[in-house]
């Protein structure tokens, strides 16, 4: 059995220096340091920025766009296709995507979505084998669930903060960001459920869940760093 640490944090935790010390997993007398960090996140929560900061501060490799490029090389899929389908259900109809792909294992030929998922999974496992790294999204928390040297993080935020972030980052108009956020969340939920059987964003699936809207991106990054330093 692997012991997990669940932490609920509020804004009052900011500025406390070495808040957590080092995080280890102990099993049968063995001590394992958290060398691999997976960052799952709500769209617009700043998860990528947090992951990048963590990697820079710890000196870990960082895989986000880099993972997309590697999958493109090996699979032959265009990077744009991977960005759209590498962690999102089909844009046309999420429910139909789920129902259609639920029977994929009854067919000899894998769908393009399945081929992409399998390729991504293999690359994520290979990257983890290389050593200390931060991996953003793409079901990495599930793919690496049996590794005891992993810290699985979920980043969430309130709708207003997320809406402001995507307006600033992507130039989204003020009228539509909430709708875009809801659509992105739904597609991620369906994709994650389809390939993992788990509920995306459910606290029990992660070691720590942080609210970047309440804590701030920098504080979230610092907390994760303290857990692994």
Show which residues each predicted segment covers.
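Short, Lys/Arg-enriched N-terminal segments with co-localized hydrophobic residues
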Residues: 3-32
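Extreme N-terminal starter segment of soluble prokaryotic enzymes
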Residues: 34-36
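Glycine-rich phosphate-binding P-loop
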Residues: 39-52
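Short beta-strand-centered segment that lines the nucleotide-binding/catalytic pocket of NTP-utilizing
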Residues: 61-72
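ATP-dependent small-molecule kinase phosphotransfer cores
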Residues: 72-132
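Small-molecule kinase domains that catalyze NTP-dependent phosphoryl transfer to phosphate-bearing small molecules
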Residues: 92-98, 173-218
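RNA pseudouridine synthases
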Residues: 127, 140-146, 165
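Conserved phosphate-donor/acceptor-positioning beta-strand/loop module used by diverse small-molecule
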Residues: 146-169, 174-184
């Amino acid at each position: 059995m692997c012991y997990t640490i669940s932490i609920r944090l509020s804004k009052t935790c900011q500025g406390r220096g070495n808040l957590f010390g080092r995080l280890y997993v102990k099993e049968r007398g063995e001590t394992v340091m958290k060398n691999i960090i997976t960052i799952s996140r709500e769209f617009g929560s700043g998860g990528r920025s947090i992951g990048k900061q963590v990697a820079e501060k710890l000196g870990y490799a960082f895989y986000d766009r880099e993972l997309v490029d590697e999958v493109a090389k090996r699979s032959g899929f265009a990077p744009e296709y991977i960005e759209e389908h590498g962690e999102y259900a089909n844009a046309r109809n999420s429910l139909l995507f789920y129902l259609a792909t639920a029977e994929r294992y009854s067919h000899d030929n894998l769908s393009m979505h399945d081929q992409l998922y399998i390729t991504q999974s293999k690359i994520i496992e290979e990257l983890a084998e290389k050593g200390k790294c931060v991996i953003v999204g793409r079901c990495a928390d599930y793919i690496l669930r049996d590794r005891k040297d992993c810290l699985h993080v979920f980043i969430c935020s309130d709708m207003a903060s997320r809406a402001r972030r995507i307006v600033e980052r992507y130039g989204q108009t003020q009228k539509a960001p909430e709708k875009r956020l809801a659509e992105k969340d739904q597609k991620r939920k369906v994709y994650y459920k389809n390939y993992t059987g788990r509920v995306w964003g459910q606290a029990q699936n992660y070691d720590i869940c942080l609210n970047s809207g309440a804590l701030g991106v920098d504080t979230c990054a610092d907390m994760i760093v303290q857990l692994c330093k």
